[in-house]
Amino acid sequence: MEQLLLLGLNIHSMKTKRSVSIQFTKTRHIICKAHINGVAAQMLIDTGASSSCIHSELQEHFKLCRKGDTFNAAGASQGKMKAVLTRKSILQLGRHEVGKQAFVLLDLSHVNATLKIQGTLPIEGIIGADFLKKNKVIIDYRNRKLSL
């Protein structure tokens, strides 16, 4: 079977990827529906966030187990913030189980405050570059899909 390579992407394998619907906020942020350990979540897709995060107040809600001690994490707008890693949890995007994912528990109140001002529903977490790179995610803006 002949395969076409374009800009380093294997077009054949792109066709066999799973797709997940995404939505755009009024400010063009990308949102997708997810489940963490079977519990529904609204997640922000953020290519600039190095790690995937969950709002620290939701640790019990998502049945997340801490792993290690609290540390200082650097945020784009909040400077240093207290954070802690979680053990890997079952992550599902759309209707596709994508495997186990560790998260950083972080206070995302400032993110939700900004989203509220912009008329957007709050998020429970952020899907960051760690997940996006590991899973070779492609963001299809025209068709409003993530290809996994």
State where each predicted segment sits.
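Pepsin/retropepsin-fold aspartyl endopeptidases
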Residues: 1-148
